[in-house]
Amino acid sequence: MGSLITLCAGTSLAKSLFPFVGAEGTTTYRLIFSTLLLMAFWRPWRRTWTWSEAPILIMFGATLGVMNLLFYNALKTVPFGLAIAIEFTGPLAVALWSSKKPLDFVWIVLAVIGMGLILPLGPQGIDNPAALDPVGIAYALGAGVCWALYIVIGQRVADRIGAFATPMGMLVAALVVTPFGIGVAGSSLLNMEWMLIGLGIALLSSAIPYSLEMYSLKHLPKQTFSILLSLEPAVGALAGWLVLSEQLSLQQLCAIGLIMAASMGSAMTAGQRQITN
């Protein structure tokens, strides 16, 4: 839970930087400072690298960078909790891809209903109070696709390279995103105040959550960890309400609940399959 709280706090803080350096500049801060922190911790230069590992590392890092860039752009117009819920459909799709039990299709139905409740599009107004910006929705869905690819590619990278893939992937992600940040924010990225906030975002959104998740994975069953991770949309909605004063309708809260239920159910049935096997 600590990792979820710090991650959501970091993302809420990130949104406060958007008026000054944009979503692109904020993403650049997060990835550059996260790279420096992870490099200092893992010291990947101790490992012997080969050129044959470069293609999969580039795919891994590029996917990570684009995922962060799309998600932060989604946050410009979509409430935090809803953006997380939409993005969650990516890993949920990966988890359900190989589903065979009839119960697994219940989680698919719940996720589809939840997305249906989120997706009223068009201009928000009296006749359409739950409407969301379609561009923001597209960004969040794109981030979900990247998250799904990140999981699939990440499994291969982890098997081949291990923990050193994390700092190297983050380095590639930073290299991919930095041109966008410079293009939008320019010299504003060198503002010391914004840089310090960017460092705080990297700590809260990457370094601290990653450390806590690594500790949790060592001390919690994988199924329990996955179920706790499913609480992220709710924590995000709460953080958005407390920090950003974002208000969600009852329909949108129900949508978040359905997607969370689908994610938890998928984690539980996956755990049962592993026990059976």
Where would I find each of the regions flagged by the language model?
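Specific transmembrane alpha-helical segments of multi-pass solute transporters/efflux pumps
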Residues: T6, W42-A83, M115-I118, A202-L220
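C-terminal-most transmembrane helix of multi-pass membrane proteins
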Residues: L31, W194, S230-N277
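Specific alpha-helical transmembrane segments that line the substrate/conduction pathway
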Residues: G25-T35, Y72-P102, A143, Q223-W241
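Loop-to-transmembrane alpha-helix entry segments
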Residues: W51-P55, I84-E87, W97-L121, A130-G136, ...
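Membrane-interface interhelical linkers
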Residues: M1-G2, S34-M59, K100-V106, Q124-L132, ...
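Helix-helix packing/entry segments at the starts of transmembrane helices
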Residues: Y29, A83-I86, I153-A174, S206-L242
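Glycine-/small-residue-enriched transmembrane alpha-helix faces in small-molecule transporters
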Residues: M1-G25, M59-A62, V66-L70, V109-I113, ...
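Transmembrane alpha-helices of multi-pass small-molecule transport proteins
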Residues: F20-V66, L92-V94, L110, C146-Y150, ...
